[in-house]
């Protein structure tokens, strides 16, 4: 009877156990079939298996992320795509970001299944799918954040020269998707690097651990083009926005002082600018979240390729993996807090959410939207 039970279990690697007296220490990969071991970097096979409770805790955490991200990003896509007042060229980038964030959460069921089976349960095929989804959504979100920064930069620093049209916004979004494609296809086809399990063997990413020149070159290249480039663009655009706002306010105060008046702004101008600033703050917050969530992962991959690999324990590498997914869950709620017109639509369509948006700022955002659409019609 015992022989029959043991036959149904996946065979263990001979080196997968260490015995010390009556205690047994299992290593990662102890429950992986022999034909799947070849896909796991040797670094992880030398690491101790974490307690089962850690797997289960991460599985439950990802269940929460999956539902929160699906609900939040689903509502953003629904409202931004069906509300006429929100259907503007600028919001095409917000919609694109929500799509990338939604795609990011679609790989959560793979992680959840692996976690509750304590390892590389679904095998290499689903590992490739998991990593492909992660590469597309992560790199795409970064480049979309840069595009949002570019758009906000033009809206706030060049209010009389808004040249963003639907055609231009769609083309920019298509370029973003095309930009992401090589970083998925190259490791997926193993033409350059490969996708492999990482950490607790429940998630997958590009190989940053193999000790060869090609791996180091790939890690350095993808780090530059998928993290450094969008980060530099984001920092440039938002630093220009902040500088413009401070200089503009300073100029208005000085002019008002010369004219011996309290302020040169009308109530309408104040309301309109408040709405624009709130939208800019939302964009800045999301870009900050992108930077905070992806920096640990970038540092981890650089350590794996160029540094001391002993620093990369399974538990340590799971933290950056979780922060990357967390930002996809938070993004839509940042807009729910900060975007006046989106809050107004939420209040109208989902009154049970208890959103209370003042009509003044939403109306000013609406007038800005109308002005944009009028300018686009004139340009056409």
Curated annotation (Swiss-Prot):
Glycosylated positions are 6
Where in or outside the cell? Membrane
Which Gene3D superfamilies does this one have? Rhodopsin 7-helix transmembrane proteins
Question: Topological domains (Cytoplasmic): residue ranges?
Answer: 80-91, 151-168, 246-281, 339-380
CDD domains linked to this entry: 7tmA_photoreceptors_insect (cd15079)
Q: Which GO terms describe its molecular function?
A: G protein-coupled photoreceptor activity
Q: Which residues lie on this side of the membrane: Extracellular?
A: 1-54, 115-130, 194-217, 306-313
Gene Ontology BP term (one): phototransduction
Q: Where is this region: Disordered?
A: 359-380
Q: How is it modified after translation?
A: Phosphorylated on some or all of the serine and threonine residues present in the C-terminal region.
Name the residue ranges with Low complexity bias: 361-380
N6-(retinylidene)lysine carried by residues: 325
Disulfide bond positions: 127-204
Q: How does it sit in the membrane?
A: Multi-pass membrane protein
Say which domain of life the source belongs to.
Answer: Eukaryota
* Transmembrane regions listed in the UniProt entry: 55-79, 92-114, 131-150, 169-193, 218-245, 282-305, 314-338
UniProt keywords (A-Z) are: Chromophore, Disulfide bond, G-protein coupled receptor, Glycoprotein, Membrane, Phosphoprotein, Photoreceptor protein, Receptor, Retinal protein, Sensory transduction, Transducer, Transmembrane, Transmembrane helix, Vision
What cellular component terms from Gene Ontology apply here? Answer: membrane
| Annotated coiled-coil segments of the chain | none
What more the UniProt record tells us is:
Each Drosophila eye is composed of 800 facets or ommatidia. Each ommatidium contains 8 photoreceptor cells (R1-R8), the R1 to R6 cells are outer cells, while R7 and R8 are inner cells. Opsin Rh4 is sensitive to UV light.
Query: What family classification does the UniProt entry report for this protein?
Result: Belongs to the G-protein coupled receptor 1 family. Opsin subfamily.
* Protein function: Visual pigments are the light-absorbing molecules that mediate vision. They consist of an apoprotein, opsin, covalently linked to cis-retinal.
Q: What is this protein called?
A: Opsin Rh4
Q: Which gene encodes it?
A: Rh4
């Amino acid at each position: 009877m015992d022989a029959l039970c043991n036959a149904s279990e996946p065979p263990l690697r001979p080196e997968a156990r260490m015995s010390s007296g009556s205690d047994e220490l299992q290593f990662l990969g102890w429950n992986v079939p022999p034909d799947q071991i070849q896909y796991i970097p040797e670094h992880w096979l030398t690491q101790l298996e974490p307690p089962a409770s850690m797997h289960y805790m991460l599985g439950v955490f990802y269940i929460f992320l999956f539902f929160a991200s699906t609900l939040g990003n689903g509502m953003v896509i629904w409202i931004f795509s069906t509300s006429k007042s929100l259907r503007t060229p600028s919001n095409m980038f917000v919609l694109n970001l929500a799509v990338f964030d939604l795609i990011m959460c679609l790989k959560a069921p793979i992680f959840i299944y692996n976690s509750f089976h304590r390892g590389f349960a679904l095998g290499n095929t689903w590992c490739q799918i998991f990593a492909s989804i992660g590469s597309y959504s992560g790199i795409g979100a970064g480049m979309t954040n840069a595009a949002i920064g570019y758009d906000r930069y033009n809206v706030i620093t060049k209010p009389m020269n808004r040249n963003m049209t639907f055609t231009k916004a769609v083309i920019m979004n298509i370029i973003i998707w095309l930009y992401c494609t090589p970083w998925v296809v190259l490791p997926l086809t193993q033409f350059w690097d490969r996708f492999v399990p990482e950490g607790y063997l429940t998630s997958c990413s590009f190989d940053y651990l193999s000790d060869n020149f090609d791996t180091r070159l790939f890690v350095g290249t993808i780090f530059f083009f998928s993290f450094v480039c969008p980060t530099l663009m984001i920092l440039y655009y938002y630093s220009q926005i902040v500088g413009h706002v401070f200089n503009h306010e300073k100029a208005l105060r000085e002019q008002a002082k010369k004219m011996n008046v309290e302020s040169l702004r009308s109530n309408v101008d104040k309301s309109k600018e408040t709405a624009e600033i709130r939208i800019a703050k939302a964009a800045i917050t999301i870009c900050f979240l992108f930077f905070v969530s992806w920096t640990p992962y970038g540092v981890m991959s650089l350590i794996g390729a160029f540094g001391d690999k002993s620093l990369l324990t399974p538990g340590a590498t799971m933290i950056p993996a979780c922060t990357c997914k967390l930002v996809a869950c938070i993004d839509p709620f940042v807009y729910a807090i900060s975007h006046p017109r989106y809050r107004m639509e939420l209040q109208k369509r989902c009154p049970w959410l208890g959103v209370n948006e003042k009509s003044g700022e939403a109306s000013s955002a609406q007038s800005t939207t109308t002005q944009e659409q009028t300018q686009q019609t004139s340009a056409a």
